[in-house]
Amino acid sequence: MQWLAIGLGAAFGACLRGWLARFNPLHHWIPLGTLGANVLGGLLIGLALVWFERMGSGLSPNIRLFVITGFLGGLTTFSTFSAEVFTFIHHGRLLAALGLVGLHVGMTLLATALGFYCFKLVL
């Protein structure tokens, strides 16, 4: 049952990631789909951390596997992000690479904190 929860979650997350990838060509140095997937993943993991903390042991472990390992694992794009940064470096665009790293890390951390604290206020 655990593998099914992870697999189904990953399928949904990957589908959303694929849809978001359509936005990558809209800007010449910021792959917006990748950034959107990572920022959304950061926001959702913040929400999930609070939700799972509040639900405690009354929640099936398979739900956590579905959401965090599956869905968010399928949605977020660290390997794609790494490839995009490397491509900038490889083409001599070091400032663009550094800017992209700062943008992804900074916005994802902010989104995680936003999701965490906003959801904590609601619950």
UniProtKB/Swiss-Prot annotation:
One of its GO terms (molecular function) is fluoride channel activity. The chain crosses the membrane at residues 1-21, 32-52, 66-86, 94-114. Na(+) is not transported, but it plays an essential structural role and its presence is essential for fluoride channel function. Na(+) binds at G73, T76. GO terms for cellular component: plasma membrane. It is found in: Cell inner membrane. Keywords: Cell inner membrane, Cell membrane, Ion channel, Ion transport, Membrane, Metal-binding, Sodium, Transmembrane, Transmembrane helix, Transport. It is a multi-pass membrane protein. The keyword Metal-binding applies. Pfam families: CRCB. Its main location: membrane. It catalyses: fluoride(in) = fluoride(out). The keyword Ion transport applies. One of its GO terms (biological process) is cellular detoxification of fluoride. Belongs to the fluoride channel Fluc/FEX (TC 1.A.43) family. HAMAP family: FluC. Fluoride-specific ion channel. Important for reducing fluoride concentration in the cell, thus reducing its toxicity. This is Fluoride-specific ion channel FluC. It comes from Psychrobacter arcticus (strain DSM 17307 / VKM B-2377 / 273-4). The lineage of its organism: Bacteria, Pseudomonadati, Pseudomonadota, Gammaproteobacteria, Moraxellales. The gene is fluC.
